[in-house]
């Protein structure tokens, strides 16, 4: 039987040399929220703790300014 190989997670922000995660960079932020609007945890994405904190505050700031939705699944 083939052995399951899990790809090593790496921090995208460290690899790209990002200093600060901007709340206006919606394409990056959308990659780190689920379709229901929840923030994806770092154990899934592999993001380092420093960038995960910046990411969470940037997502929350973008939500507050109505750039991102708080929840995305409205069935009405």
UniProtKB/Swiss-Prot annotation:
One cellular-component annotation, GO: cytosolic small ribosomal subunit
Molecular function in Gene Ontology: small ribosomal subunit rRNA binding; structural constituent of ribosome
A single GO BP: translation
Keywords, in A-Z order: Ribonucleoprotein, Ribosomal protein, RNA-binding, rRNA-binding
Transmembrane segments: none
Highest taxon listed in the record's lineage: Bacteria
Alphabetized InterPro entries for the sequence: Ribosomal_bS18, Ribosomal_bS18_CS, Ribosomal_bS18_sf
Pfam family, one: Ribosomal_S18
PANTHER family: 30S RIBOSOMAL PROTEIN S18, SMALL RIBOSOMAL SUBUNIT PROTEIN BS18M
Functional note: Binds as a heterodimer with protein bS6 to the central domain of the 16S rRNA, where it helps stabilize the platform of the 30S subunit.
Family: Belongs to the bacterial ribosomal protein bS18 family.
Quaternary structure, from the entry: Part of the 30S ribosomal subunit. Forms a tight heterodimer with protein bS6.
Name used for this protein in its record: Small ribosomal subunit protein bS18
Organism per entry: Alcanivorax borkumensis (strain ATCC 700651 / DSM 11573 / NCIMB 13689 / SK2)
Source taxonomy: Bacteria, Pseudomonadati, Pseudomonadota, Gammaproteobacteria, Oceanospirillales
